[in-house]
């Protein structure tokens, strides 16, 4: 039996795009400053696959990052967007190899997933195991939009 697939919106408005671009610049600048010279990638792009799954208590994002060290990954949640950025460095190789087949990707990567709902990001967690990055965002009760009675007093204003 196959699991249900929920629809998520991936269109990000232009103001949020500018914020996201700034966040990505900061994340990559931090990686440049902290990664050892031999783990830094100067060109190339990597496109790791990801899954987004929802349970009753959380949303989980699983990203395939085989060969990427934990110190080469940054995770950020802003507004309703989860951003995963990092660098996958090529393994040590011989000088001037002759390739017969090239399928693996190396370089910087950034994935952004827009999520709906309310999350307790202070309890969010991420773990890297066997080449899979698992990010768990616990849900909290949505309070926005619920009616809330504001008491009315007769007399002077309160500050």
Model segments located where?
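Short, well-ordered beta-strand segments enriched in hydrophobic/aromatic residues
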Residues: 59-65, 134-137
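Core FKBP-type peptidyl-prolyl cis-trans isomerase
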Residues: 69-97
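C-terminal tail/sorting-segment detector
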Residues: 138-159
């Amino acid at each position: 039996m196959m699991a249900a697939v929920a629809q998520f919106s991936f269109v990000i408005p232009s103001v949020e795009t500018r914020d996201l671009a700034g966040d990505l610049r900061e994340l990559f600048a931090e990686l440049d400053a902290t990664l050892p010279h031999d783990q830094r990638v100067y060109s190339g792009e990597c496109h790791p696959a990801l899954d987004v799954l929802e349970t009753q208590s959380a949303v989980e994002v699983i990203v395939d990052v085989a060969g990427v060290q934990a110190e080469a990954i940054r995770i950020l949640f802003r507004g309703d967007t989860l951003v995963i950025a990092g660098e996958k460095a090529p393994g040590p190789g011989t000088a001037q190899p002759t390739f017969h087949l090239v399928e693996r990707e190396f370089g910087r990567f950034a994935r952004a997933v827009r999520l709906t709902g309310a999350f307790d990001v202070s309890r969010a967690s991420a773990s890297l195991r066997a080449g899979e990055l698992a990010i768990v965002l616990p849900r909290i009760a949505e309070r926005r939009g619920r009616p809330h009675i504001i008491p009315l007093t007769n007399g002077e204003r309160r500050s």
